């Protein structure tokens, strides 16, 4: 085990330095402290924080920040980049401290691209585009929009797991194409003072993929005004987001999902709920009620993979 400690009592004082010296499948234990740095992981490692609230990796890059002769852009703004299969992270906070989206644009805390990635008992904090669950969609909408570490990577099926995590943000703060499973997570929407305060998810699930986002026993909380946040909208037309036994706060819009003004997506998205405290009569026609049999099948399919 490699130990990181700011007081010099470990093997390294920097998480990035520990990563550089680690071998595949090593465990890096990170002692309490605020580590202001960007961390890039390209090998299957395990991160274990001493305490989730008091072991913090933070940085403050953002999309509108100048980088050479251009802007940083969304996908180079990350605090932590996970570009490998089989990474695990436990008991740690990863934050992008750049600030509100209206001021700085997108600012990723965790950029996760790879299969069998797992975050457990973690806090992932940001504002706009907090957590990117890669891979990217097949094509960008604007030229150069995907500039970043996996711009030219193979677009492939990637499974990710977020267990007992606290994830905070405002606009599209969980987004991407992964098959991502969230269990017993708290998804906290930050008030940004608008009539519509934001969107929790923006999936870009690939056409034909078995599932996109599945949220099981999660809690949607926030400090926003009532009826001001959507649970999701489709970043791409085949977005999938399924809610099973989730608890929805009063800040969530009664219709739950927005179509991002894409009427064509009504026939292609897969938005569904089961056992969730929402009024079915308020749901738009592109959101369906899932019965318990289908919900159990979805959960079984995920756990058996």
Please tell me what each predicted stretch does.
Residues 1-305:
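Sequence-level preference for short, compositionally simple segments enriched
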